[in-house]
Amino acid sequence: MVMQFQGLENPIQISLHHSHRLSGFVPEGMSVKPAKGMLTEHAAGPLGQNLDLESYSPYNNVPFPQVQPQISSSSYYSNLGFYPQQPEDWYSPGIYELRRMPAETGYQGETEVSEMPVTKKPRMAAASAGRIKGDELCVVCGDRASGYHYNALTCEGCKGFFRRSITKNAVYKCKNGGNCVMDMYMRRKCQECRLRKCKEMGMLAECMYTGLLTEIQCKSKRLRKNVKQHADQTANEDDSEGRDLRQVTSTTKFCREKTELTADQQTLLDYIMDSYNKQRMPQEITNKILKEEFSAEENFLILTEMATSHVQILVEFTKKLPGFQTLDHEDQIALLKGSAVEAMFLRSAEIFNKKLPAGHADLLEERIRKSGISDEYITPMFSFYKSVGELKMTQEEYALLTAIVILSPDRQYIKDREAVEKLQEPLLDVLQKLCKMYQPENPQHFACLLGRLTELRTFNHHHAEMLMSWRVNDHKFTPLLCEIWDVQ
């Protein structure tokens, strides 16, 4: 198949060979302007053609294209008599063509990433984020620490032990009643006490998301820790009340400055929110499943239409992400297809928790359970929605998380991971500051948000299994879903 992206000038066509999957859908009760396109097959466009893309440059040279809502509200299943009749070109070529945006329409301001030198650096796994210098000791066992792993300063041994324990959901039993004093010797003798000490010292399962806790963030964490230690030491040494007061005032001012967005970060956030808010699901799709009760087959068709709208929203939002169209076109496709499932579930979680009228969440769950989808997949889906709801996320956090999901540098088939990471890092920095601003009493809120992204990754597997069962039962999908999910 060929995915066709078009811009303001000449369309660009790219073959899609990457395999992905999915579906987990919740309607959104907002109406939008209809668009005119989607991903479909096309006869032309060799993969090896010269795409004439500009090389990656920092955000001060990245255009912020004008955002226009382009979501279709029409139905693919019009021939079944279940939906209103729509024009035949509803899924014609061109709706989902990504095109280069002219630089003159873009935002020319600088962000923090533009101040960083564009140099090569080694890739870091999430667990090894934040290398350190000196002879710091592991807070768990006292061995020499290698860096900040899962939110705590630990050695390589405790990092690996914590990762294995969480991944395998391991349950250990202490022979001494849980009273072991953890050190380099005892860490090999008592796993229960070692895991408990890991958690007591701040290690978080939520941080096990590849690429999100970057070296920059860990440096910021150490900087804040050093400033706090310095402030405490100065306060203890000073007997003068006036000097104590000046120190406290200075420290307070520093902390306040660190939790305010810079002008460039605010501009970036405003742009992301403008793009995010202009992509909404047609209201009539919501009304279908909430106002009437249908057969399992009809419910499945409605859910398929919802999924199609979600993918349309994803493509339009992705096209507008700052810097996205400076990436290699094959990387653009890999990011889009790789994030389709996770972005859909994340948007659905927002709708489920914030957009549905009172009492409709339970009704929606009931209708989806009657669509023929196995409870094996539905139960974790709604558990995820509810766990996200418990975090009391703002719309800004939903929008930034969605952008972070899309710009994940560890997707399969990505050729230039460093370029993708450079686009993702400013979004992570903004999200981290917002967490401190909105929930200052909860210092772990940022880590909890990243933990939801870890949970999202599991839905790729669930969705692949769902697709397999649907294909066995000969369920049909729209051309866009077949393209984005690689359904033959």
Curated annotation (Swiss-Prot):
<keyword id="KW-0043">Tumor suppressor</keyword>
<dbReference type="GO" id="GO:1904179">
    <property type="term" value="P:positive regulation of adipose tissue development"/>
</dbReference>
<keyword id="KW-0805">Transcription regulation</keyword>
<dbReference type="GO" id="GO:0000122">
    <property type="term" value="P:negative regulation of transcription by RNA polymerase II"/>
</dbReference>
<dbReference type="GO" id="GO:0043066">
    <property type="term" value="P:negative regulation of apoptotic process"/>
</dbReference>
<dbReference type="GO" id="GO:0007043">
    <property type="term" value="P:cell-cell junction assembly"/>
</dbReference>
<keyword id="KW-0238">DNA-binding</keyword>
<dbReference type="InterPro" id="IPR050234">
    <property type="entry name" value="Nuclear_hormone_rcpt_NR1"/>
</dbReference>
<feature type="zinc finger region" description="NR C4-type">
    <location>
        <begin position="138"/>
        <end position="158"/>
    </location>
</feature>
<dbReference type="GO" id="GO:0071638">
    <property type="term" value="P:negative regulation of monocyte chemotactic protein-1 production"/>
</dbReference>
<dbReference type="GO" id="GO:0043235">
    <property type="term" value="C:receptor complex"/>
</dbReference>
<keyword id="KW-0675">Receptor</keyword>
<dbReference type="GO" id="GO:0046965">
    <property type="term" value="F:nuclear retinoid X receptor binding"/>
</dbReference>
<dbReference type="GO" id="GO:0000791">
    <property type="term" value="C:euchromatin"/>
</dbReference>
<dbReference type="GO" id="GO:0038185">
    <property type="term" value="P:nuclear receptor-mediated bile acid signaling pathway"/>
</dbReference>
<feature type="binding site">
    <location>
        <position position="377"/>
    </location>
    <ligand>
        <name>chenodeoxycholate</name>
    </ligand>
</feature>
<dbReference type="GO" id="GO:0050728">
    <property type="term" value="P:negative regulation of inflammatory response"/>
</dbReference>
<keyword id="KW-0010">Activator</keyword>
<keyword id="KW-0479">Metal-binding</keyword>
<keyword id="KW-0395">Inflammatory response</keyword>
<dbReference type="GO" id="GO:0008206">
    <property type="term" value="P:bile acid metabolic process"/>
</dbReference>
<dbReference type="GO" id="GO:2001250">
    <property type="term" value="P:positive regulation of ammonia assimilation cycle"/>
</dbReference>
<dbReference type="GO" id="GO:0032052">
    <property type="term" value="F:bile acid binding"/>
</dbReference>
<dbReference type="GO" id="GO:0035774">
    <property type="term" value="P:positive regulation of insulin secretion involved in cellular response to glucose stimulus"/>
</dbReference>
<dbReference type="GO" id="GO:0042742">
    <property type="term" value="P:defense response to bacterium"/>
</dbReference>
<dbReference type="GO" id="GO:0046628">
    <property type="term" value="P:positive regulation of insulin receptor signaling pathway"/>
</dbReference>
<keyword id="KW-0863">Zinc-finger</keyword>
<dbReference type="GO" id="GO:0001228">
    <property type="term" value="F:DNA-binding transcription activator activity, RNA polymerase II-specific"/>
</dbReference>
<dbReference type="GO" id="GO:0038186">
    <property type="term" value="F:bile acid nuclear receptor activity"/>
</dbReference>
<feature type="zinc finger region" description="NR C4-type">
    <location>
        <begin position="174"/>
        <end position="198"/>
    </location>
</feature>
<dbReference type="InterPro" id="IPR001728">
    <property type="entry name" value="ThyrH_rcpt"/>
</dbReference>
<dbReference type="GO" id="GO:0005829">
    <property type="term" value="C:cytosol"/>
</dbReference>
<feature type="modified residue" description="Phosphothreonine; by PKC/PRKCZ">
    <location>
        <position position="458"/>
    </location>
</feature>
<feature type="DNA-binding region" description="Nuclear receptor">
    <location>
        <begin position="135"/>
        <end position="210"/>
    </location>
</feature>
<dbReference type="Pfam" id="PF00104">
    <property type="entry name" value="Hormone_recep"/>
</dbReference>
<keyword id="KW-0007">Acetylation</keyword>
<dbReference type="InterPro" id="IPR000536">
    <property type="entry name" value="Nucl_hrmn_rcpt_lig-bd"/>
</dbReference>
<feature type="modified residue" description="Phosphoserine; by PKC/PRKCA">
    <location>
        <position position="146"/>
    </location>
</feature>
<dbReference type="GO" id="GO:0008270">
    <property type="term" value="F:zinc ion binding"/>
</dbReference>
<dbReference type="GO" id="GO:0071222">
    <property type="term" value="P:cellular response to lipopolysaccharide"/>
</dbReference>
<protein>
    <recommendedName>
        <fullName>Bile acid receptor</fullName>
    </recommendedName>
</protein>
<dbReference type="GO" id="GO:0032088">
    <property type="term" value="P:negative regulation of NF-kappaB transcription factor activity"/>
</dbReference>
